[in-house]
């Protein structure tokens, strides 16, 4: 190995020169190009003698800056080591490079002889300098470091004169970054197939062949014998030689990096709080609630990070063999877990505030000195905790990589890595769950009944589970939300456009039983009770199961204390007990009917005060609160408007998206503008309304016939399904059951079939109601309830005949006319643009033809 090769290896070993991944044909040319700007030279001297370089240009842009770096290196060498150096212009211009090379070889020898490159190699001019190589103080450093460095660059030329293949063992883990590289773990055995100078070898491991860094491995031999390199100048180190010095130096470098980045992260948190969030808290830009969402528990996290920095500093003051970095992290892990999980749970609400008030917050941030756009600075600042949390496993992995095998802190470092990985994954899960929870609380829920969901209180816990009712083998995906007094069940619509209400379970009298894993279920628990039919709930993970069991058991104890006595007639209407099915109150006094439904039934207080009278409903379906019967009870569910259906199909034609994108925010109801209001007030609009009224009156004249026909259909269908109705009320109740069953399982139906089932249930209700009207009330016609048959063509070309209310049909037609007018305006505008473009093209063509016909035009004009 010649002097150029030795110098390249020396610089790479010290970490001041990047190792080339390809074979170097001429080491001298490579070295000359690497040293030309003087950055490597300054980095080398700063590594050997920290603090000797006063000024350096890390990225020189011109000749003067390059020469300045070289002269700074020469000045420091002359002042500190009194070496015979070279001329700066010679190195920059590529002249007399032998003199430059000779100076570097001399520098290598001098620093090795005086013991530099060991204690001083990784020392930094920092107030947090770490003690290193304490165990080396009893040994002489004379010529030892030279042999240490030689043992490193000896690996670059480890060919043997014998025909036996070179076998090496990995000292560190290596992960490939290119396709032609070879990945391996610490301790793996690699068969070397090609040895090249420059720091990279080719080898085979587990059937794969690729390139790997030679300083990541060591040779496996029965006895260490002198190697015969090409130059014949370097020998293998003696048997008792210590090969851990450089690993120790890297360990201290990584530890120093952890400490410095921890300082920087703590300062960034304090800056965000003092510069932006605290002034925002005292201003009137946002309400106090929104400001608290933005703040979260960032104050507590900032205080905790300062404590963590102090603990790490105390740890680094100890000798290396007594440092307990992993133990420091493990001792603070419970507090860190609590703080970061709370921050993750609040972050979706903070993002919602950022989105809603982005303009105001952006202006406020820019007034406080933030760069434009100011909202981006705040968003990045609030994301700092997640970014830092993701870096801990990587930093600790690097620290463990350069740690001695028998270091007492190795086991704690490995435990800390696992703990941080679990915490990071748990934080991501909490963020996703809270985003979904916020979406459920802010968007409309289909088929919702009762008070608004916000009146139920705060959500204690929620997740996606699989439920199975007693006596049924069918499993359904559900979203469970636990509120202070009840458990809410939702399902996602078939097209993932929103959520569908499925029912509520009161926590009063609820019993939670954790089940052992079996072939049929894993991570499952059972919900039961005197008023509740058994429900089997399967969770996605063991952690999710633990959370549900803990929260539900705690919740049931709280509700039991607050409600010591439970009476059947005082049960809320939105409950799911399991009672025998009784068709009417008439059977309650006689022998009970042995009917055990495979789904949950809902208690309904009897009109006569009998607590035993129950009315069956569909699985997990809410009952309707008892109200005085009126004609408005016959109103159907809102029909699917054609314009909304078309938009819905357009969304389905796009590529799949994430759950968040598949559940978009509901489009707000269209409000009439001032222009529309004025039109409605006009005489023409009044005449149009008069015409609509005439059409309604014409259809009302045939209402009696249609209702009689619906009654006939209803009776036939009831007989077909063996449903008996003794009076008007039981008839309506049985129809309610059919209505619930018709929309029971949205996961098995399309959106169109779901709405068809709603219209079918409406027809049953209309038929039964018409019979009641004949017997007890005079004929009353409501325009909103009159139906017409509409023939509609779907997007797939299929023609469907639907029944819609007259008023909804008229307004749908009005919307379609409005859309046609807008399309007509767009087409007219496009036509005008096309005409203008054609005229411009015609002028251009005429001009070109005129020039071509001009006799003065010839090839000389080209």
From Swiss-Prot:
Which residues span the membrane?
none
Q: Does the keyword 4Fe-4S apply?
A: no
List residues, modification Phosphoserine. 132, 155, 164, 228, 236, 497, 673, 776
What GO molecular-function term can you cite, just one? guanyl-nucleotide exchange factor activity
Question: How is this protein annotated for GO cellular component?
Answer: cell cortex; centrosome; cytosol; focal adhesion; lamellipodium; mitotic spindle pole; plasma membrane; postsynapse
Question: What are the Basic residues biased-composition ranges?
Answer: 657-669
DH domain spans which residues? Answer: 250-430
Presence of the UniProt keyword Cell inner membrane in the record: no
Instruction: Return one Gene Ontology term, BP aspect.
Output: hematopoietic progenitor cell differentiation
Q: Where is the PH domain?
A: 452-557
> What Pfam families does its record include?
betaPIX_CC, CH, PH, RhoGEF, RhoGEF67_u1, RhoGEF67_u2, SH3_2
Which N-terminal stretch is annotated as signal sequence?
Answer: none
| Compositional bias annotation for Low complexity | 731-744
Question: Which residue stretches belong to region Disordered?
Answer: 559-591, 657-679, 728-748
User: What are the disulfide bonds?
Assistant: none
> Which part of the chain is the Calponin-homology (CH) domain?
1-112
Compartments in which it is found:
Cell junction, Focal adhesion; Cell projection, Ruffle; Cytoplasm, Cell cortex; Cell projection, Lamellipodium
Give tissue specificity per the record.
Seems to be expressed in the central nervous system. Isoform B, isoform C and isoform E are expressed with highest levels in brain and testis.
Q: Which UniProt keywords apply?
A: Cell junction, Cell projection, Coiled coil, Cytoplasm, Guanine-nucleotide releasing factor, Neurogenesis, Phosphoprotein, SH3 domain
* Residue runs in coiled coils: 804-854
| Known partners and oligomeric status | Interacts with PAK kinases through the SH3 domain. Interacts with unphosphorylated PAK1. Interacts with ITCH. Interacts with SCRIB; interaction is direct and may play a role in regulation of apoptosis. Interacts with GIT1 and TGFB1I1. Interacts with FRMPD4 (via N-terminus). Interacts with CaMK1. Interacts with BIN2. Interacts with PTK2/FAK1 and RAC1. Interacts with PARVB. Interacts with YWHAZ. Interacts (via PH domain) with NOX1 (via FAD-binding FR-type domain).
Its annotated function is as follows:
Acts as a RAC1 guanine nucleotide exchange factor (GEF) and can induce membrane ruffling. May function as a positive regulator of apoptosis. Functions in cell migration, attachment and cell spreading. Promotes targeting of RAC1 to focal adhesions. Downstream of NMDA receptors and CaMKK-CaMK1 signaling cascade, promotes the formation of spines and synapses in hippocampal neurons.
Please report the name of this protein according to its UniProt entry.
Rho guanine nucleotide exchange factor 7
């Amino acid at each position: 190995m010649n002097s150029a090769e030795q110098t390249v290896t020396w610089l790479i070993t010290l970490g001041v020169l990047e190792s080339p991944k390809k074979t170097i044909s001429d080491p001298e040319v490579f070295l000359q190009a690497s040293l030309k700007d003087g950055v490597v030279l300054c980095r080398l001297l700063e590594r050997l003698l920290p603090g000797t370089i006063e000024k350096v240009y890390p990225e020189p842009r011109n000749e003067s800056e390059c020469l300045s770096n070289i002269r700074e290196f020469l000045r420091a060498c002359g002042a500190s080591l009194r070496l015979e150096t070279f001329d700066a212009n010679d190195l920059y211009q590529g002249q007399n490079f032998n003199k430059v090379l000779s100076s570097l070889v001399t520098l290598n020898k001098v620093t090795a002889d005086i013991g530099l490159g060991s204690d001083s190699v990784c020392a930094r001019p920092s107030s947090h300098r770490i003690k290193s190589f304490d165990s080396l103080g009893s040994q002489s450093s004379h010529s030892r470091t030279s042999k240490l460095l030689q043992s490193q660059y000896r690996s670059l030329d480890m060919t043997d004169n014998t025909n036996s293949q070179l076998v090496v063992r990995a000292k560190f883990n290596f992960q490939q970054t290119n396709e032609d590289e070879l990945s391996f773990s610490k301790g793996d055995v690699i068969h070397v197939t090609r040895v090249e100078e420059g720091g990279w070898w080719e080898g085979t491991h587990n059937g794969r062949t690729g390139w790997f860094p030679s300083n990541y491995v060591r040779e496996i031999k029965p006895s260490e014998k002198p190697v015969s390199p090409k130059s014949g100048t370097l020998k293998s180190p003696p048997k008792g030689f210590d090969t851990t010095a450089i690993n120790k130096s890297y360990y201290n470098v990584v530890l120093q990096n952890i400490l410095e980045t921890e300082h920087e992260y703590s300062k960034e948190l304090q800056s965000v709080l003092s510069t932006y969030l605290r002034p925002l808290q005292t201003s009137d830009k946002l309400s106090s609630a929104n400001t608290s969402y933005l703040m979260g528990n960032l104050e507590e996290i900032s205080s905790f990070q300062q404590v963590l920095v102090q603990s790490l500093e105390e740890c680094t003051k100890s000798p290396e063999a007594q440092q307990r970095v992993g133990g420091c992290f493990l001792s603070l892990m419970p507090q860190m877990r609590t703080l970061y999980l709370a921050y993750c749970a609040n972050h979706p609400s903070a993002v919602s505030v950022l989105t809603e008030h982005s303009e105001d917050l952006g202006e406020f941030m820019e007034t406080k000195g933030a760069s434009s756009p100011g909202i981006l600075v705040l968003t990045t600042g609030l994301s700092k905790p997640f970014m830092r949390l993701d870096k801990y496993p990587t930093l600790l992995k690097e620290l463990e990589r350069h740690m001695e095998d028998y270091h007492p802190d190795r086991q704690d470092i490995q435990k800390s890595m696992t703990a941080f990985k679990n915490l990071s994954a748990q934080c991501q899960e909490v963020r996703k769950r809270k985003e979904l929870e916020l979406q459920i609380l802010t968007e409309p829920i289909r088929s919702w009944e009762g008070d608004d969901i916000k009146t139920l209180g705060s959500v204690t816990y929620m997740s996606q589970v699989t439920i199975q009712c007693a006596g049924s083998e069918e499993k359904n995906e559900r979203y469970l939300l636990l509120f202070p007094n009840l458990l809410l069940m939702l399902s996602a619509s078939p097209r993932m456009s929103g959520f569908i209400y499925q029912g509520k379970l009161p926590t009063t009298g609820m019993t939670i039983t954790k089940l052992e894993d079996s072939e049929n279920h894993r991570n499952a628990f059972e919900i039961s009770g005197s008023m509740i039919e058994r429900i089997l709930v399967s969770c996605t993970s063991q952690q999710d199961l633990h959370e549900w069991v803990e929260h539900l058991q705690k919740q049931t104890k709280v509700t039991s204390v607050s409600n010591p006595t439970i009476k059947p007639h005082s049960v809320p209407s939105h409950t799911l007990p399991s009672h025998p099915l009784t068709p009417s109150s008439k059977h309650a006094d006689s022998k009970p009917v042995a009917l055990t439904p495979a789904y949950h039934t809902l208690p309904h207080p009897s009109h006569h005060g009998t607590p035993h009278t129950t009315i069956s409903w569909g699985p997990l379906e809410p009952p309707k609160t008892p109200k005085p019967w009126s004609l408005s009870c016959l109103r159907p569910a809102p029909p699917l408007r054609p314009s909304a259906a078309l938009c819905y199909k357009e969304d389905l034609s796009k590529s799949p998206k994430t759950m968040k994108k598949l559940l978009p925010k509901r489009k707000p109801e269209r409000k009439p503008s001032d222009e529309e209001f004025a039109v409605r007030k006009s005489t023409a609009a009044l005449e149009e309304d008069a015409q609509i009224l005439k059409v309604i009156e014409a259809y009302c004249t045939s209402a009696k016939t249609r209702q009689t026909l619906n009654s006939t259909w209803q009776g036939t269908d009831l007989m077909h399904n063996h449903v008996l109705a003794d009076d008007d009320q039981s008839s309506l109740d049985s129809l309610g059951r059919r209505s619930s069953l018709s929309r029971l399982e949205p996961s098995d139906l399309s959106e169109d079939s779901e709405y068809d089932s709603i219209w079918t249930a409406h027809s049953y209700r209309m038929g039964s109601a018409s019979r009641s009207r004949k017997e007890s009330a005079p004929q009353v016609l409501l325009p909103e309830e009159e139906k017409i048959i509409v023939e509609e063509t779907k997007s797939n070309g299929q023609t469907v005949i639907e029944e819609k209310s007259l008023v909804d049909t008229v307004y749908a037609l009005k919307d379609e006319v409005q859309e046609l007018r807008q399309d007509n305006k767009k087409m007219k505008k496009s036509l005008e643009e096309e005409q203008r473009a054609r005229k411009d093209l015609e002028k251009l063509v005429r001009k070109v033809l005129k020039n071509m016909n001009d006799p003065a035009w010839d090839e000389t004009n080209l």
